[in-house]
Amino acid sequence: MNEPTYNYNDFLMPALADGQPDISIEISEITKKQWNQLIGIHEVVVYKDCRKLFPAAKFSVRGLDPALLYSVEICFDVLSPFTFSYNKKLEKWIPTKTPVNCQSSALSSMICETGDWFMNGDMDFGALNITSSHEKAKEKIEQNRIAVCLSSRTMYQIRVVLYEMQNDELIYLKETKFDEMIFITCTEYRGQVNRELKKSMNRFSRKRKYEISGTKCQRSKRPAKLPVESLDEKELKNAEKGIMSLLESSPSSPSYLYQYQYNSPQSIPSSIYDSLYPSSPEEYQMVHTFPQTDQLSPSFQTSPTVHYDFYNQQYYDNSFHENYFQSYNRL
């Protein structure tokens, strides 16, 4: 029996007729730049505990009547009827045969203001909380907070719907979907590029909080494993035991540094399509799922040098950012 084939366009919802051509809804410039950096491999981590959506959802609206009341709703449409799994060999998300167990569209709370208010600033959904628990989302909504429940390993696309308020009724005006705002929910980041970009841009991440406040975040998780395959084990133990004596004898020395090489991608795919489907018959045999629909994106890798400081328990990496430090107890 032949395997069913699915095209990406089959997952997209048909757009409604645009009866308001003079009204435009666009992504704000800063938000658009952040989403474009992550398109193709964009992952959004969702836990039971609520967390902020990053990059934030900010939009600008033009062509409204300044005196009328409007309401804007943000929706999360499910694009694929199947869940996704991450294939480590291919380093990409692959559709599975497991159906999605959630509603076709998850809605958040609305913003209700005048047309003048909408056009003088951005519609900012930066306070939006995402969670995988319906109970947690309900608690936030009862506290007059914006929250939405999303299922894990599911592909979503953000859609914005604009209404006009007349006599306490909502009159549909326009809706807009954004190809930049397509993502897959997961419980942990899989892509190294995605992880590094999130840490460098997201002000809610532990690394960015440390840079802003100057105080390290306490973590209860066990330390990550050191790259012992690149270090001499005996020399590593001796360095840890004698580090204090080494520092006292040479206080001006750079702490006692080791270095090792690793490969880290410096560029990300420019299209989301290349990240979702096998690109050759060989890859199809590896994952036993849908046949190819696109060509494989080229991978860009370099080999920057990373130093590890045993005394301060930090990595120093000069390949991504100048003076970039990452805590030893990292994710």
Curated annotation (Swiss-Prot):
- Would you tell me the protein name for this molecule? Putative T-box protein 36
Q: Return the annotated DNA-binding positions.
A: 29-210
Source species, domain of life: Eukaryota
Which Pfam families does its entry note? T-box
The entry's localization annotation reads: Nucleus
Which organism was this protein described from? Answer: Caenorhabditis elegans
Q: Does the keyword Mitochondrion apply?
A: no
Q: Which GO terms describe its molecular function?
A: DNA-binding transcription factor activity, RNA polymerase II-specific; RNA polymerase II cis-regulatory region sequence-specific DNA binding
Q: One GO CC term of this entry? A: nucleus
What's an example GO BP annotation here?
A: cell fate specification
Q: Does the keyword Transcription apply?
A: yes
Arranged from A to Z, the UniProt key words for this protein are: DNA-binding, Nucleus, Transcription, Transcription regulation
